[in-house]
Amino acid sequence: MDTAIILGLLVAVFYGVGTFFAKIVCEKNPLFQWIVVNIVGIILCLIILLKYKNIIITDQKILTYAIISAVLVVIGSLLLYYALYKGKASIVVPLSSIGPAITVALSILFLKETLTLPQMIGIVLIIIGIILLSISN
């Protein structure tokens, strides 16, 4: 099996289990969950920086993209935790899962990536599933 596929599945497992525990915390205080996630992230970043000292990129364009990405991901995680506080994980999480379809669309438009027919069908089925989950509320 392709390494990227294995890593993608691991991401899904880690996000899935992590979001389950986040839902439990968010029922008490979504800001606390967000703060803990960011503190743990900073600690992990420091560990990585100590190990890989030449990881810093000084190219302005790449740095700008990295900052934009970080701001959007941080805001997205805060909104996810607040949504978990306000609603059911069974509704919020599938709705938030449309994010990868947005990434795919942007990658096709701007990075000129292409999809095979099975990939297109898979994305359409995911979107249909998300719609069905959201209207069943």
Curated annotation (Swiss-Prot):
Keywords: Cell membrane, Membrane, Transmembrane, Transmembrane helix
UniProt cross-references to Gene3D superfamilies, sorted A to Z: 1.10.3730.20
Domain EamA: 13-135
Main location: membrane
Bilayer topology: Multi-pass membrane protein
InterPro entries cross-referenced by the UniProt entry: EamA_dom (IPR000620)
Pfam family, one: EamA
Source organism superkingdom: Archaea
S-adenosyl-L-methionine is among the record's keywords: no
GO cellular component term of the entry, any: plasma membrane
Parts of the chain that traverse the membrane: 4-26, 35-57, 62-84, 89-111, 116-135
Subcellular location per the Swiss-Prot or TrEMBL entry: Cell membrane
Protein name per the record: Uncharacterized protein MJ1333.1
Taxonomic source organism: Methanocaldococcus jannaschii (strain ATCC 43067 / DSM 2661 / JAL-1 / JCM 10045 / NBRC 100440) (Methanococcus jannaschii)
